[in-house]
Amino acid sequence: MASWTKIYMLEEPKLEKPVLVQGLPGLGFVGKLTVTYLIDELKLKPFARLYSTHLTLLDGSTGVHINSNGTFFLPKLEFYAYNQKKPNIVFLTGDTQPTVYGQYEVAEYVLDFVQKYGCE
């Protein structure tokens, strides 16, 4: 099966040398909960979404989940921008992590994407 990873823009943020803060589910959900809390407190909206065949569904499989009502769920990671104070921050979060065999491809897409905004 051919793999793919795509980032879809929702809006173009204005950022100045931002820092990337990633919070994905893992041991204890500490990173995920922290980033989600900050996103909620700062009332941020996503500016981009990453979709990939390397992101797992909630049951650990990959692909598309089709609900009983015919709607579907495709796993994604979301980017949020905070530019009210310095340093500007790009938050990355989602409900899943990349597969072991796809983590480098997804990481490469994420890093290439945030470097366009000046992240180092």
Language-model regions, residue ranges each:
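N-terminal short beta-loop-beta anion/metal-coordinating cradle
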Residues: M1-D95
